[in-house]
Every structure is written in structure tokens, then in C-alpha cells.
Amino acid sequence: MFKKFSIFISSSCIIAACIFTPSNTDDNFIFPIKSNYYITSKFGYRTLYGKQNFHTGLDVAYSVGTKVYSSSDGKVSYIGFDHDGYGNYIIISYNNFKFLYAHLNDTHNVSLNDTVFKGTLLSSIGPKILPNGKRNGNTTGAHLHFEVRVDNKYMDPLDFISLPK
């Protein structure tokens, strides 16, 4: 379904652009947290540590221990730890979608190749420094970094999931 239609006017031509957004605005996917939220960084370009970079997801501040749930049905396709980036993280794959949940407390609630359902408890928000002394990725504090990828392309999570009211 075509969700947006924009016309951009240049000095010498008109360019029409249709932006395709899958029809998933009917709550096929859910927000991964079931409590109040505070968005600290949106998808797109941002300045962090004095440098401009592209942020591939949505950062939402929460207290350490806040539960994180699967946004969709799917399969656990990756579980890992990245000291310089995501910290503890889990990827759930569903059709051509991948949902990444990062800076988690641990990854023990699910195993690789597990089938999960929308609302399945995946983990909880982890601290900046994990109990083993390792940094929980590139983080300035406790938060969930949440990504949506479609056909392995980074997409704005807010195009697919409505924020809780």
C-alpha cells in the first residue's frame, strides 16, 4: 500500500516520489516495552560524542530491569554480545523483517532458533556496566536500542510500530 506521496520541486524539474510502507499499521507488531517510555534518540542522523552519525534504530530510556517483549511472532535468529555497539542483543526474524533488541541485561530467556510469539518475554534492560564488569555496548545509560530491518535495510521503527499511549 502506498502510504505517502510527496512531490519535490527542483530548479529545473519535478520529481515525484512514492514511499512504500508495508501495511502493518493495523497493530501486526507491538512496542517491545509495556510501560511509560522516553525516547532519547530517534532513527536517522544525530550528533553523539561531538560527531555526526546515522542512528539505525530507536533509543528509549528505561530503568534497569524493565522487561523487553518480542514485537512480533518469529524465530530467534541471532543472540550475541558486542562490546563496542549493541552489548547483549537478540534478533527476531519474521518473514522479511528483523527486529533487534540491544543493551539487554542478558540473553538467557530464549535460545537460538526458538519460535517466539508477539509479546514473548525476551529479556530486560541492562545496566551501562554489566555484573561481569563489561560495558553493555556503546551506551550512555540504561535504555533499549530497538531496530527494524526490512530485507536487511534499516528502517525507522516508528513506521512499523505505534508508541503506547
Protein language model annotation of sequence segments:
Residues M1-N28, K165:
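N-terminal secretion targeting segments of exported proteins
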Residues K75, A102-N109, D159-K165:
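A short, sequence-level motif marking secondary-structure junctions
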Residues L58, I92-S111:
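Active-site region of chymotrypsin-like
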Residues A16-N88, N95, F117-K118, L158:
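Surface-exposed, glycine-biased beta-strand/turn segments
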Residues N88-I91, D114-K165:
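Conserved, short, structured surface segments that act as functional micro-motifs
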Residues F43, V64, G80, N105-H108, ...:
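A generic structural motif
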Residues K51-Q52, L104, N136:
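Short, solvent-exposed loop/turn segments at secondary-structure boundaries
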